[in-house]
Amino acid sequence: MKENDVVLRTVTKLVVFILLTFGFYVFFAGHNNPGGGFIGGLIFSSAFILMFLAFNVEEVLESLPIDFRILMIIGALVSSITAIMPTFFGKPFLSQYETTLTLPILGHIHVTTITLFELGILFSVVGVIVTVMLSLSGGRS
């Protein structure tokens, strides 16, 4: 890339914000509507890859406190533990638990264990996609 890609870098800052916002929306809407951890992870990955394309890969990696290989492992562990945990309580594998919390400012919040499982999927997808793309590009994986 040329050093004076002002338009690309400016547009990237806006588009990355939009992608990350949309990724959060898709992730949290996933247990009631289409979406979830996998699609949210792909959207988050595309935001990271766009940053790598617009800016120097090493600078982006230095500014992000994320090791994508560790993120991949953490995601797999979170999903596995969430899936296996119900068997210790005599329930079937991948059983879902839900409750409603009442918080002073936020009001009633519907909390499910599937959200934690989907978060693990999101972490795994982001970790795998970004690690593969960095490896293919010759950057630090």
Swiss-Prot record:
InterPro entries: CPA3_antiporter_subunitB, MnhB. One of its GO terms (molecular function) is antiporter activity. It comes from the Bacteria. The gene is mnhB2. Keywords: Antiport, Cell membrane, Ion transport, Membrane, Transmembrane, Transmembrane helix, Transport. The chain crosses the membrane at residues 10-30, 35-55, 70-90, 114-134. One of its GO terms (biological process) is monoatomic ion transport. GO terms for cellular component: plasma membrane. It comes from Staphylococcus aureus (strain MRSA252). Pfam families: MnhB (PF04039). It is a multi-pass membrane protein. Belongs to the CPA3 antiporters (TC 2.A.63) subunit B family. It is found in: Cell membrane. This is Putative antiporter subunit mnhB2. The keyword Ion transport applies. May form a heterooligomeric complex that consists of seven subunits: mnhA2, mnhB2, mnhC2, mnhD2, mnhE2, mnhF2 and mnhG2.
